[in-house]
């Protein structure tokens, strides 16, 4: 959108020179922009000091300005002497960059931009502290971690380079319970083990078993817990089923000397086997 207003020249204005606006007593005044400043606009005609002129400010993307020195394509530009355009290395006063070469005194076309190839040095960032500046200068993840994390043992852990000393220090850092530390270091005493059991197991019967000295009540409860509360009884054996058998009654060795007595002793043995359930 164009902005139009009447202004008074407080110095002789030359066409294609950079302008700066200021507030007069009753009117806006214009003059050549000061050196090393960012201008407000560019003059399109000559205006004598004290004359009134109509200023029409268009939202242009490019201006044509008289070069105050030799300019190369891509040069960052600021205001030179008498409102000319000159190259600069100071990003704080850049208002555009050249899109063509020009010698001193010639018109140069420039793009209005304060972001063209402006580089900011980390050390120039006033609000950044020393640690922040160091972090901004790092270009590797490991380097950034080394700045963010001060603890050497934690750094070793994150970098995957822990020594036994690092591991012990990390255990001390992460765990306050001495029994847990002893467990992690594989250096548990009987006292540590008992304390860890108390820490990890709430069931009194399991604790009794782990202690190696379960009470009779502990044993009964544990058997019930694992499904062994009722003794298992074998089924009776049959001719087709394997099962439990009783021990047969004692049978003396036969002393028979004839068939009749031998048969009698054999029948007695068969009876004992039947009674024991060994045979039908």
From Swiss-Prot:
Gene that specifies this protein: 8.5
Known partners and oligomeric status: Homotrimer. Forms a super helix coiled coil in the homotrimer.
Protein name (database record): Capsid fiber protein
A GO biological-process term: virion attachment to host cell
GO cellular component terms listed in the entry, alphabetical order: virion component
Family: Belongs to the phi29likevirus major capsid fiber protein family.
Compartmental location: Virion
UniProt organism field: Bacillus phage PZA
Taxonomic superkingdom: Viruses
Segments passing through the bilayer: none
InterPro entries listed in its UniProt record: Phage_B103_Gp8
Main location: virion
């Amino acid at each position: 959108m164009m902005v139009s207003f009447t202004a008074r020249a407080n110095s002789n204005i030359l066409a294609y020179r950079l302008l700066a606006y200021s507030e007069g007593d009753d009117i806006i005044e214009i003059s050549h922009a000061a050196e090393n400043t960012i201008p407000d606009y560019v003059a399109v005609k000559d205006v004598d000091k004290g004359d009134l002129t109509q200023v029409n400010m268009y939202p242009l993307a490019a201006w044509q300005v008289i070069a105050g020195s030799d300019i190369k394509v891509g040069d960052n530009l600021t205001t030179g002497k008498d409102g000319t355009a000159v190259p600069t290395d100071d990003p704080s006063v850049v208002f555009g960059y050249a899109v063509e070469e020009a010698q001193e005194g010639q018109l140069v076309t420039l793009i209005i931009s304060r972001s063209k190839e402006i580089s900011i040095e980390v050390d120039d960032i006033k609000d950044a502290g020393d640690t922040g500046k160091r972090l901004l200068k790092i270009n590797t993840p490991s380097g950034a971690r080394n700045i963010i994390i001060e603890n050497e043992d934690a750094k070793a852990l994150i970098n995957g380079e822990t020594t036994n000393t690092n591991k012990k220090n990390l255990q001390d850092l992460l765990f306050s319970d001495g029994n847990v530390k002893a467990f992690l270091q594989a250096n548990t005493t009987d006292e540590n083990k008992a304390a860890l059991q108390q820490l990890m197991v709430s069931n009194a019967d399991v604790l009794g078993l782990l202690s190696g000295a379960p009470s009779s009540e502990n044993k009964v409860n544990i058997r019930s817990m694992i499904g062994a509360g009722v003794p298992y009884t074998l089924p009776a054996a049959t001719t087709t089923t394997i099962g439990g058998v009783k021990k047969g009654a004692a049978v003396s060795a036969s002393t028979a000397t004839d068939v009749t007595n031998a048969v009698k002793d054999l029948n007695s043995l068969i009876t004992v086997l039947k009674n024991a359930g060994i045979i039908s």
